């Protein structure tokens, strides 16, 4: 069995934080891991901006619900699934990805978890593990799966 691992944002779907930044007019939220490779620094930065602007999960999900997979993404994923076991490895959050996973036919997804307060505000997050994309590939290889990976983080 061969496993194909794909990044999600910028590969199969639009960048969620960029779409949210454009909708809200808050350009600071356009920063991605390409701009700030330390994910913890990037997320603390994002959470601070959200709190300063009194924005939470509901507002982000409203924007996500307007998004669609990139042109050809679903067809490509269907083609790939006929040939490989497909796993999406992403630095996004389950609360963000779910509506888009539905549109992509629910591929296996490994990502992070948000901590949301009762007031809808994002109060933190839990990384699946340190260096999660690389560690997933290492894990698959340790189980003797032939693994390929594609995206801006591999």
Residue ranges and their predicted role:
Residues 128-154:
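Conserved Lys-Pro-Asp/Glu-containing loop-to-beta segment of HAD-superfamily phosphomonoesterases
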């Amino acid at each position: 069995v061969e496993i194909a691992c794909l990044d999600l944002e910028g590969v199969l779907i639009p960048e969620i934080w960029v779409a949210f930044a454009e909708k809200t007019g808050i350009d600071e939220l356009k920063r991605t891991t390409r701009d700030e490779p330390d994910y913890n620094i990037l997320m603390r930065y994002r959470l601070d901006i959200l709190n300063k602007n009194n924005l939470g999960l509901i507002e982000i999900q409203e924007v996500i619900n307007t998004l669609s997979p990139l042109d050809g993404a679903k067809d490509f994923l269907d083609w790939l699934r006929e040939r490989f076991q497909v796993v999406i490895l992403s630095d996004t959050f389950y609360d963000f990805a779910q509506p888009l996973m539905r549109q992509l036919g629910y591929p296996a997804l490994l990502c992070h978890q948000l901590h949301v307060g009762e007031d809808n505000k994002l109060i933190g997050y839990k990384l699946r593990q340190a260096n999660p994309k690389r560690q997933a590939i290492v894990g698959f290889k340790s189980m003797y799966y032939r693994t390929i990976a594609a995206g801006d983080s591999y």
